[in-house]
Amino acid sequence: MELNSIKPAAGASKNRKRIGRGTGSGHGKTATKGHKGQKARSGGSVKAGFEGGQMPMHRRLPKRGFKPLSKKVYSVVNLSQLDAFEQGSCVDVEAMQKSGLVKDICDGIKILASGELTKSLTIKAHKFSAAARDKITSVGGTVEEI
């Protein structure tokens, strides 16, 4: 094999469309823009959400509610998921990430009480629900807020 004989796989590369270069090219004269109208002009594009003068959808629908910018979003982990760890082990943020329980830590990790925990673990997280805290301590585990 030589460098001058290497070719890309079939269908891997496409020729770019050259427009406005004569009728023989198949894309001459109107350059694939059709005849007249706003979209045929230079800079002629309809702005996003424009519906031809009709009242646009985003103005027809009522305003509703409020989303606070300061609201914290926690990644949720249930007790049933934590039951996969070994007896007496320390479950912290790194351990949860390594085991694939948590992908993105938004503003922290919150432990919820869904499912059963059968092993005593030391769990370190940013938040705990009251029920989760009770279940962990009842099994003999410890809760540490980071």
Swiss-Prot record:
UniProt xrefs under Pfam families: Ribosomal_L27A
Annotated Basic residues bias: 30-39
Region Disordered, residue ranges: 1-64
Database matches in PANTHER family: 50S RIBOSOMAL PROTEIN L15, LARGE RIBOSOMAL SUBUNIT PROTEIN UL15M
Sequence similarity: Belongs to the universal ribosomal protein uL15 family.
HAMAP family reported for this sequence: Ribosomal_uL15
Assembly behavior: Part of the 50S ribosomal subunit.
Function statement: Binds to the 23S rRNA.
Protein known as: Large ribosomal subunit protein uL15
Gene this chain is encoded by: rplO
